[in-house]
Amino acid sequence: QSISCAESCVWIPCATSLIGCSCVNSRCIYSK
């Protein structure tokens, strides 16, 4: 199950990567 982190990563990396989100198709996604 993937959850949107309400952040995009088109120009900058995901700040939410600190809590486990990753960049997928220009969106920050959290996948368990």
Curated annotation (Swiss-Prot):
Q: What residue ranges are annotated as transmembrane? A: none
- Please indicate which superkingdom the organism of origin belongs to: Eukaryota
Name the family.
Answer: Belongs to the cyclotide family. Bracelet subfamily.
Q: Which Pfam families match?
A: Cyclotide (PF03784)
Q: What is known of its domains?
A: The presence of a 'disulfide through disulfide knot' structurally defines this protein as a knottin.
Q: What is this protein called?
A: Acyclotide phyb-M
Lineage at the top is: Eukaryota, Viridiplantae, Streptophyta, Embryophyta, Tracheophyta
Which residues carry the post-translational modification Pyrrolidone carboxylic acid, per the record? Q1
Which tissues and organs express this gene's product?
Answer: Expressed in midvein, lamina and periphery of leaves (at protein level).
Q: List the disulfide bonds.
A: C5-C21, C9-C23, C14-C28
What does the entry report about post-translational modification of this chain? Contains 3 disulfide bonds.
**What role does this protein play?**
Probably participates in a plant defense mechanism.
Q: Which organism is it from?
A: Petunia hybrida (Petunia)
For this chain's UniProt record, which GO biological process terms are given? defense response
Task: Keywords in alphabetical order, please.
Answer: Disulfide bond, Knottin, Plant defense, Pyrrolidone carboxylic acid
